[in-house]
């Protein structure tokens, strides 16, 4: 608040729906049938965690941590076989991240991109500029496609060429189910939110087309908020999906893909830098205000946009009244924060 910024806290969980996996139905991961990304918006109950949230989160962390340890072992073996004397441990990578972000080592949980970044940085630290291309070629099993001054591109190559399915450092993921993921979001005080890929996949995932059927499936899950990452979408497709969803009583939010070191704009853009349609911008702003209001009210012990079971706030006669009221409350929260004097 002292910097006049309203942080909206959230999390993302990967779940697996075996019945859709068996049927070959892609949900919102274009390469993996049955794999579901689900988000939680307006998280409030994370410090301290409730015992229920702690149990649900620990199961996910335990599975992830074991997978990362096994991948690090395979990465080290690949490096050794290539004659590259880099062997990073789980603790090594965690300490790097903790130093970078100024956080306790105990707060760090590794993901694939952390491992790829650590190996790229360590190879560059150990090899002179003239020798880096050869070292990377040995490590990757072929010349890098990215320029040597493109650190993020090289990290992405390490990940895609060594760590993905069918690659030498790959370790299969283990996932929780949908109900586990939804329960964790609610136990942390959040709003379950469906990330919509739409034309971010080609062809569009079976679960997500046509938009009217997707809306019905989201509502069947008792989810009342969706998210778009518009940098993946053509403006007309984004507008078609977002407007239909909002008319159906779903809150619309936006993400900006800031999950790597790529220097992307903070303001949402569509594919190839095209502007987000004005009507969708308004929906994104409305959604941000709803999340801000939910977060502020839950923090003060009041009812949020959804309750602890994920049911919509019953103080309002319908979705339109609920969304409008929370958007208005959230706009006040944001305005009161950004207009206060800087310390």
Residue ranges and their predicted role:
Residues 1-104, 227-283, 287:
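A metal-dependent hydrolase metal-coordination microenvironment
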Residues 25, 36-40, 47, 134, ...:
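Hydrophobic transmembrane signal anchors and adjacent membrane-proximal interface regions, especially
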Residues 272-343:
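Extended, intrinsically disordered, low-complexity segments
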Residues 56-249, 333-334:
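Domain-core and long-helix interface of multi-subunit machines
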Residues 71-79, 146-152, 221, 252-267, ...:
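Short flexible/disordered coil segments
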Residues 114, 224-227, 259-270, 326-342:
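Repeat-unit-sized solenoid/scaffold elements
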């Amino acid at each position: 608040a002292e910097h006049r910024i309203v942080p909206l806290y959230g999390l993302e969980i990967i779940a697996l729906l075996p019945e859709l996996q068996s049927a070959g139905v892609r949900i919102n991961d274009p390469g993996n049938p049955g794999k579901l990304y689900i988000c939680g918006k307006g998280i409030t109950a994370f410090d301290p965690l409730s015992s229920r949230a702690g149990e649900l989160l620990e199961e996910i962390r335990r599975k992830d941590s074991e997978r990362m340890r096994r991948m690090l072992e395979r990465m080290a073996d690949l490096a050794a076989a290539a004659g590259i004397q880099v062997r990073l441990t789980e603790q090594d990578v965690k300490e790097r991240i903790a130093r970078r972000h100024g956080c306790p080592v105990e707060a760090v949980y590794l993901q694939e991109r952390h491992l790829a970044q650590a190996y790229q940085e360590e190879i560059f630290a150990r090899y002179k500029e003239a020798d880096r291309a050869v070292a990377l070629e040995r490590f990757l099993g072929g010349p890098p496609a990215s320029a040597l001054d493109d650190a993020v591109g090289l990290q992405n190559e390490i990940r895609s060429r060594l760590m993905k399915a069918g690659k030498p450092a790959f370790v299969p993921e283990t996932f929780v189910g949908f109900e586990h993921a939804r329960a964790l979001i609610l136990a942390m005080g959040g709003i379950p939110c469906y990330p919509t890929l739409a034309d971010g996949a080609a062809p569009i995932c079976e679960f997500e087309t046509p938009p009217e059927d997707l809306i019905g499936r989201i509502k069947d899950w008792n989810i009342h908020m969706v998210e778009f990452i518009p940098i993946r979408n053509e403006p007309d497709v984004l507008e078609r999906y977002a407007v239909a969803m909002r008319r159906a009583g779903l809150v619309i939010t936006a993400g900006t893909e800031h999950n790597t070191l790529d220097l992307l704009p903070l303001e949402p853009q569509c594919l190839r830098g095209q502007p987000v349609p004005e009507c969708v911008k308004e929906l994104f702003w409305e959604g941000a205000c709803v999340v801000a209001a939910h977060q502020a009210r839950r923090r003060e012990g009041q009812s949020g946009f959804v309750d602890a079971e994920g049911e919509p706030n019953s103080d309002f006669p319908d979705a339109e009244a609920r969304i409008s009221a929370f958007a208005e409350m959230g706009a006040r929260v944001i305005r009161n924060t950004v207009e206060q004097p800087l310390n």
